[in-house]
């Protein structure tokens, strides 16, 4: 699994935190290599006004402050989710983890990476700036890992405050498509992606 590989390059027992909507994927990452990754604990509550009320488990805070590796599986697919994700990302980085990685499996604003008319806003650049504000971790800049970014030039929207890694899960897709195509008597896989 591509996300597990991005984490497994760090030391053992990386704490993986995640947005609640990413819980199934986070569990799959841990299941792929439970000796290298364990779930970090965080309470995702909300105040009456809807703003997040987040609390990182005390034992995990202690582990991070003592140099544990840390990663966050972000879910930035809706504007409503961005604030809570970023609040926790900033807090985790500030705890001083030896290494801190923000895993972005879907860069939702990525398809709006260029402008072709005066006044149009490249929201991909805005999201990159928000992620670029991630504080440094114990060893220096935090790392933002973006999967299957829409356009390679988007890596240059990030500032030098963070280290950016572009990864792809396309090889895994190719493997799965080949597996499906090899099934006897089964329909051939068809890939459709609407893009204007």
PLM segments and residue spans:
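PRPP-associated nucleotide enzymes
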Residues: 1-196
């Amino acid at each position: 699994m591509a996300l597990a590989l991005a984490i497994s390059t760090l030391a053992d027992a990386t704490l993986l935190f995640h947005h609640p909507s990413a819980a199934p994927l986070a569990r799959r990452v841990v299941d792929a290599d439970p000796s290298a990754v364990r779930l970090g604990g965080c309470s995702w509550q909300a105040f009456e006004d809807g703003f997040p009320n987040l609390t990182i488990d005390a034992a995990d805070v202690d582990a991070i402050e003592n140099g544990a590796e840390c990663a966050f599986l972000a879910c930035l697919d809706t504007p409503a989710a961005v604030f809570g994700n970023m609040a926790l990302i900033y807090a985790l980085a500030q705890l001083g983890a030896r290494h801190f990685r923000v895993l972005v499996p879907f860069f939702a604003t990525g398809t709006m990476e260029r402008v072709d008319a005066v006044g149009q806003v490249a929201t991909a650049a805005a999201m990159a700036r928000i992620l670029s504000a991630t504080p440094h971790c114990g060893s220096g800049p935090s790392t933002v890992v973006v999967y299957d970014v829409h356009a390679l030039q988007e890596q240059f929207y990030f500032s030098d405050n963070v280290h950016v890694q572009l990864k792809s899960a396309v090889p895994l897709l190719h493997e799965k498509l080949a597996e499906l195509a090899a099934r006897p008597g089964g329909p051939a896989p068809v890939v459709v992606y609407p893009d204007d």
